[in-house]
Amino acid sequence: MQFPSFAEYTEALQLDLSVVLSDPLLGRGTLRTRGPGLPLARSGNFALTYEVFADGRKYALRCFHKPADALDARYDAISRHLARVRSPHFVGFQFQPAGITTESGSYPIVRMEWAEGPNLAGFVADHRHDVNALQQLRVSLRRLARHLRDNGIAHGDMQPTNLVVRDATHLTLIDYDGMFVPELGPLHSAELGQRNFQHPGRRSWHF
């Protein structure tokens, strides 16, 4: 599947959200914009992420710009595994196979709860002189690593921008495109993550 360009998503999301988005909740929402009313997007390896305010809450709208093998099956497996694990380190999300309609057709989206707080890099910069906060953060990171290992989960793109720090004791992972859960064992990784935070020998079959 060929996904829309950034420009095509920008054009579509300037229209009435209830028309271009199939999700009733997001369709009632308001998109965060910049400058002359253009949708504000954060670009990742596979998706563009937009902020939508709906029913008093904030959500992430993720629109894909790059194909990934078995995208729907991956998100379905991840969702079911996280539901069983009841992990405190992930946000709720819903994969929608025809969630947005642009000029060229209908495409999948992911609606995610918004994780509030700075990312890991921002938290460390803000607390670089706070020894207690940094020590607690170290403990929390070790606890997170143990939790993932014990539950058969690998994030796949563990880097500072994908780790939200609400406070030094509460860490939340975002961006699940490259995640591994046991059910996905037969597949290769959909992405290799930010190379500066991966083993240099990692390949797609190192899932």
Where in this protein do the model-derived segments appear?
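Juxta-kinase regulatory segment immediately upstream of eukaryotic protein kinase catalytic domains
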Residues: 1-40, 72-75
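ATP-binding glycine-rich loop module of kinase domains
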Residues: 37-39, 45-92, 103
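Conserved structural core of kinase catalytic domains
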Residues: 91-137, 186
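Conserved activation segment of eukaryotic-like protein kinases, specifically the C-terminal portion
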Residues: 187-202
